[in-house]
Amino acid sequence: MEQASTMAEPRGPVDHGVQIRFITEPVGNAEMDTLRRGGRRPAKDARANTYGVAVRVQGIAGQPFVVLNSGEQGSDSFGVQIKGTNNRGPPGALSSDSELPESTYSHAKEFPARSQGSMSDEELGAHWNGRLLRSQSQASLKGPAPVSPSTRSTSLLQLAPEVASPGSTIDTAPLSSVDSLINKFDSRQGGQARGRTGRRMRTLPPEQRKRSQSLDNRLPRDTLDEREHQFPTHWTPSTKRDSHMGNSKQSSQNQGPLGGFSCSRQTQDWVLQSFEEPRGRAWDPGMLQFKSTPDLLRDQQETAPPGSVDHVKATIYSILREGSSETETSVRRKVNLVLEQMQPLVMTSGSAKGLTGQSELSQKVEELQQKLDEEVKKRPKLESSRLGLERQLQEKAEECSQLQELLERRKGEAQQSTKELQNMKLLVDQSERVRCGLEAQVKELQDKLKQAQEPEPAKEALMKDLLEARELLEEVLEGKQRMEEHLRLRERELTALKGALKEEVASRDQEVEHVRQQCQRDAEQLRRSIQDATQDHAALEVERQKMSTLVRELQKELEETSEETGHWQSMFQKNKDELRATKQELLQLRMEKEEIEEELGEKIEVLQRELGQARAGAADTRQMEELKKELCQTQKELKELKEEQQNQEVAGRHRERELEKQLKVEADRGQGLEQQNLQLQKTLQQLRQDCEEASKAQVAAEAEVAVLGQRRAAVEVTLRETQEENDEFRRRILGLEQQLKEARGLAEGGEVAEARLRDKVQRLEAEKQRLEEALNAAQEEEGSLAAAKRALEARLEEAQRGLARLGQEQLALNRALEEEGKQREALRRSKAELEEQKRLLDKTVCQLNKELEQIGNDSKQALQQLQAQLEDYKEKARREVADAQRQAKEWATEAEKNSGGLSRLQDETQRLRQALQASQADRDTARLDKELLAQRLQGLEQEAENKKRSQDDRARQLKGLEEKVSRLEAELDEERSTVELLTERVTRGRDQVDQLRSELMQERSARQDLECDKISLERQNKDLKSRLASSEGFQKPSASLSQLESQNQELQERLQAEEREKTVLQSTNRKLERRVKELSIQIDDERQHVNDQKDQLSLRVKALKRQVDEAEEEIERLDGLRKKAQRELEEQHEVNEQLQARIKTLEKDSWRKASRSAAESAQREGLSSDEEFDSVYDPSSIASLLTESNLQTSSC
C-alpha cells in the first residue's frame, strides 16, 4: 500500500485529548476513480459541498464522547489531529454529560475520506480558515518532544513537506470551533489541568511550511519501510499490573503478543489499557451509557463504496453489533482499534525480525537481573549459615578434646585396677602356700598318731580332730579345684578378648583409612564445587532443615553424654572407695598374719624349751632320737614349702606379665584412638580452611553449605564411633571390676579356709605339746598340785566369763540375722517394683512401635499420591507439548503453502513464529513449574528418608532399652546370687555357732571330769597323809614306797594334763572371739554392698524414666514433622491447581491463536493480489482479530 505522506523526523507520542474529523458529502464514482488513481478534485465542487464536524473528546474512564456540528460552506474534508503527550488525568476528575455540546448534525451522507497512513484511532482531518487546496491525503502530524509530566504539551499542526511545490506554505491560523470546544472541556475540571493545557502556538520554520504530497507524488514503499525501521521503541504489555506501573522502561522494551502490530502510540496506549483496566468495566451498564449523536457510521454504510475505509468500518460495525449488548460508543471504539491494529500487517519481515530480536534481548536482560537479585538476597543467609557451621565445628572439636581427657583418665584408673588385681593374686598365692604347709603338718601329725596306738581318751579326741581336719582339707581341695577352673575360664576369656581386640584394632585401622580416603575425596569435591554453579533455593532450605535437625540431635547426644560421664564419674568414685576399703582390709589381714606369725614363733620357742627339758630329764635316748628325726622331717617339709612358695611366686609373676601385656595392648589401642582424634582435628581444620575459601567465593555458597553438611555428617559419624569405643572401654573396665570382685570373694574364701586350717593346726600343736608334756609328767613334783588347783579355779572362772560373752555374741548374731531377713524382704519389694517398671517400659515400647508404623504408612501413602500426581502432570505436559508441536507443524505447513503468496503472508508467518515463541515461553514456564514440583517431591522424599532414619534411630534406642532391661535382669540375678551367698554364709555361721556350743558342752564335761579327778586326788592325798602319819610310827617295806612314788607321778601327770587342757580352752575361746569379729565385719560389708546396689538400681530406674521421656518427646517431634508434611502436601495441591488453571489458559490462548491463523489463512487464499487494501480489511480477518480475549477499547 502507498502511504499518505513521509516524515523526516522520528514519530513521537500521539495525544488522545481531542480529535476532530471533517465529514463531507459523498461524491460520484468518477471522482472516486480519480481519487484512487491519485488525482485531484476540482476546487469548485469542493467549495460547493457542505460538511460536518465530528469531535472526539476524552470522557469518563477513557470512554469518548462524540459530538457532531454542521460546518460552513467551504472546502472538502481534511483530517486534522491536535497532538499532545499521553498524560491522563485522574479517573475521578470527570464531568457530566450536560456540559458537552449537543449533536446538531443534520446530514445523512458524507464522503468517506481515504486515510491509509493514519496512525490514530480515528481519521485525521485538517481545517483551514482560508481557501484550502485538496490533495486527497491527510497531513501527517508530528508532536514535539515530551515535556514535564505535570503539564500537557500543546497541539501543533505540522504538515509534511511537499516535493512538487517547494515554495508554498501552510496557513496555521487557529480554529475557533476547536478552541472553543477545548476551552469548554478544560473549564469543567475546576482548576485542575486535564487533557491539554492549550493549543500549540509554535510557528513552523519556512522549510517545513510546505504542502503535503499528493497521491501522484508519494514516496515509494522502500522509503516508507526504511522510515518505519527507524522506530526506536516497541512496547510489550506485561502480564502483571504492578510491574508495568513500577518499571516503565522494562515495559517499553518488552514485546507482547501485539508487539508485531504496534506502529502508533495510540495502539500502544490501547494495549496498555487492555492489560491495566479491570474486565468488569466493559460490562458495567452505568459506565457504558454515554451521550452520543446519531450514528455516523450507519450513514456511512449506506453511501460508502466497497473497498473504501468507510466500507470496512461499516462491515466491522455490522459484525460487532450482531448479537452484542454493548453500546454504540464502545462498538465504534472497537472498530477504530481494529483498523489501527490491521495497519501494521503491511510491515515488512525485516522490521518484525528486529522486533523479535529486541524482545528476546529484553527478556534475557530481565532474567539476568532477576538472577542477580536472587543471588544478592541469598548471600547474607549463606554467610550467616556458614558462621553457624563454623561455631558448631569449634564446639565439636572441644568435645573431642574433652573425650580424649576422659579416655586418659580412664586408662589411668584401669592401670590402678590391674595393679590391685596383681596384689590380690599375690595374697591368694600366699594363702595357697600357707595351706600347703598346713597340709604337710597334718600329714606329720597323722603319721605320729599312727605310731602312737595307745587306747587313751586323748587319742580318740585326736582322731576326731583329724577326721574334722580331713573334711576341712577336702573342702579346701574342692575350693582349690574351683579356683583353678575359674582361673582357666578367665585365661580363656582373656585369650578370646585378646583376639577380639586384635580384630577390632584391624577393623578400626581399615575404617580410619576409609575415613581418610573419604576426607580426601570430600576435599577434592569441595575444591571442584567452589568452581561450580549455584544450586536451587529449595534444596538449600531442605539442607538447612537437615542441618537444624542434626544440630538438635547432636545437642541431645551431648547432653546424654554429659549425664553419662557424670554417672560414670560417680561409679568410679564408688569403685575407688571400695578399693580403698579392700586395701584397708588387706592391711588388717596383714596385721593379723603378723600376729599369727608371732604366736607361732612363741609356740616354737615353747616347744624348744620343752624339748630342752625333755632332753635333760629323759631316761631313754630313743625318745630323743625320735624327736630329732621329727625335727629333721619338719625342716625338710619347711624347705619343700619354701620351694612351692617360690614356684607360686614365679607363676604369679608370669600372670602379672600377661596382664601387663594386655594393658600395653589396650594402651596402644588408646594411642591409636588418640591419633584418630588428631586426624579428625586436622580434618576439621582443613574444613575450616575450606569454609574460609568458600566464603570468599560468593557464587559457590550453596554448594559449600551442602559439602559442609556432608563433612559434618562424617565428623558426627566418627564422633559416634569414638563414643562407641568409649562405651566398649567402659564395659571392659566393668568386666575388670567384676573380676576384682570375684578375686576378692575368692580371697575371702581362702582367708576363711586359712583361718580354719590355722585353728586346726593350733589344736594339733596343742595336742603335740600335750603329748610331749605327758612324757615329762612323771618327773614333776607333788607341790604343783595346789598351784594347779588354784589355776584350775581361775581357768573355770574365765571359762564361765567366756560362755557369757559367747551368749551375748549369739544374741547379736541373731539380731543381725533378723536385720538381714528384713533387708531381703526390702530387696524382694524392690525387685517387684523393677519388674513392674519393666512391664510399663515394654508397653511404652510397643506403643512407640505402633506409632512409628502408622507414621511410616502415612508417609508411604503420601508419597504414592505425590507420585501419581507427578505422573498425571507429566502426561498432561507431554500431551500439551505434542499438541503444541502438532499445531506448530500445521502452522509451518500452512506457511509453506502460502509462502508463494504476497508479502502479507510473510508477515503472518512472522506473527505465527512470534506466537510460537510465546507458546514456547509458556511451555518453558510450565516446565519450570514441573521442575519446581519435582524438586518439591524430592524434598518430600528426603523428608520421608529422614523420617525413616529417625524411625531406625528409635528402633536402635528401643534395642538399647531392651539391652539395658536385660542388664538389669542380669544384675537382679546377681543380686539374687549374692543374697543366696549371704544366706549360705549365715547358715555357715549358724553351723559354727552350733559347733561352738558343742565344744562348750565338751568343755563343761571335761571340767566336771576334772573336778571329779580333783576330788579323788584330794581323797588320795588325805589317804597318803594318813598313811605317812601311820608310817612314822613304824617302818614299812620299800615296796610300799615305790608304789607311793608311782602314784605321785601319776597324779603329777594328771595335773599337767589338766593345765594343758586349760590352755587349749583359752586358745579356743580366743579363736571363737576372732571368728565372731570376722563374721560381724563380713555382715557389715555385705550390708554396704546391698545398699550400694540399691543406689545403683535407683539410678538406673531414673535413667530409664528419662529415656522414656525422651522417647515421648521424639514421638511428639515426629507428629510435628508429619503435620508439617501434610501442610506441604496441601500447599503442593494448591500449586498444582494453579498450574492446571494456567495450563488451561495457555490451551485457550493457543486454540484462539490457531483458529485465528486458520481463519486468516483461509481468507487470504481466496483474495486476489490486486486488491491488497481490500484483502487487508476483509471482514473475516476483522472477525478473527475481534475474537481475541485481550481486545479492549482505549481512551482518546
From Swiss-Prot:
GO biological process: microtubule cytoskeleton organization
Record bears the keyword Phosphoprotein: yes
Compositionally biased spans, kind Low complexity: 1038-1050
Single annotated GO MF: microtubule binding
Stretch list, region Interaction with TJP1/ZO1: 54-67
SS bond partners: none
Subcellular location: Cell junction, Tight junction
Modified residues (N6-acetyllysine): 576
Described purpose of this protein according to its UniProt entry: Probably plays a role in the formation and regulation of the tight junction (TJ) paracellular permeability barrier.
Domains as described in the record: Deletion of the TJP1/ZO1 interaction motif (ZIM) decreases but does not abolish colocalization with TJP1/ZO1.
PANTHER family associated with the record: CINGULIN (PTHR46349:SF4), CINGULIN-LIKE PROTEIN 1-RELATED (PTHR46349)
Name of the protein in its database record: Cingulin
Phylogenetic classification of the source organism: Eukaryota, Metazoa, Chordata, Craniata, Vertebrata
Gene encoding the protein: CGN
